[in-house]
A protein has these predicted regions:
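Class I SAM-dependent methyltransferase Rossmann-like catalytic core
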Residues: 17-49
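Conserved SAM-binding loop of SAM-dependent methyltransferases across substrates and taxa
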Residues: 65-86
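A short SAM/SAH-binding and catalytic strip from SAM-dependent methyltransferases
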Residues: 138-153
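A short glycine-rich, Lys/Arg-flanked "PGG" loop and its adjoining helix->strand segment in the class I
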Residues: 154-167
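Substrate-binding/catalytic lobe of Class I Rossmann-like enzymes that use SAM or dcSAM, i.e.
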Residues: 176, 183-230
């Protein structure tokens, strides 16, 4: 509990966090269930719109202890004890430089044989996209709760676009707090409004070509407590 409390306090204060073994364990206990659930909602949206193929290649940037990975696995293969499904194939690549990769390695060891996973113990800035067995593009690029950890998230996301399939999806997911929400909107607008073919289709679909919102992307402010009448 002490580790988790310190972790949350440092995060909310904007302080640097050392991702050692203790922090990784804290993340697994505290954050994994929430990240597992969050990815499921997004994958459901992609499926409803026909944007999630049965067989897909995935890059999970800042994969952490495996919340998004497990959510993706169970969404594709189901939450059953059957670990030999006959349909679907996921070529999953995780980029994780911290001690969380050790936890992730154990988590991925319990997945289906058709969930073929590779852990790249590297920062995304140093990651070599074409160093693997194939240089096929990715169908899904996941930036789950990691953009706020990057020195230049816009440059990183822009670089990843060249490794995305023409009909692929980049998923940017951040915690619902003020700083990360505002930064996420800034990244989104820099990418979609730049010299790329990237478009935004969820959760705020762009309806008019060349037009984009200019608000800060945060609508919740803390106000003084309401005085309850006697």
């Amino acid at each position: 509990r002490s580790t988790i409390r310190t972790l949350k306090a440092d995060y909310l204060a904007g302080d640097d966090i050392e991702y050692d073994a203790a922090t990784a364990a804290g993340y697994a206990i505290y954050h994994l269930p929430a990240y597992y659930a969050a990815i499921g909602y997004v994958l459901a949206t992609l499926t409803e719109r026909g944007l999630l193929p049965a067989s897909l290649r995935v890059l999970d940037v800042g994969a952490g202890v495996g919340g998004p990975a497990l959510g993706l696995h169970d969404f594709v293969f189901g939450e059953t004890d059957d670990r030999e499904p006959t349909a679907g194939l996921v070529d999953y690549h995780a980029v994780e430089p911290s001690a969380a990769a050790d936890v992730l390695d154990r988590v991925l060891g319990e997945t289906s044989r058709n969930f073929r996973s590779t852990i790249h113990r590297s920062t995304i800035e140093a990651f070599e996209y074409d160093a693997g067995d194939t240089d096929d593009p990715f169908d899904l690029l996941i930036f789950g709760n990691v953009c706020n950890e990057l020195d230049d998230p816009v440059a990183v996301v822009e670089d990843s676009l060249s490794h995305l399939a023409d009909d692929g999806t980049i998923l940017l997911l951040e915690p619902a707090d003020r700083n990360t929400a505002i930064e996420l909107r800034e990244i989104e607008r820099a990418i979609a409004g730049g010299d790329t073919d990237a478009t935004v289709y969820a959760p705020t679909l762009r309806l008019w070509d060349g037009a984009e919102p200019d608000d800060r992307g945060w609508s919740f402010d803390v106000r003084p407590e309401i005085a309850v009448p006697a």
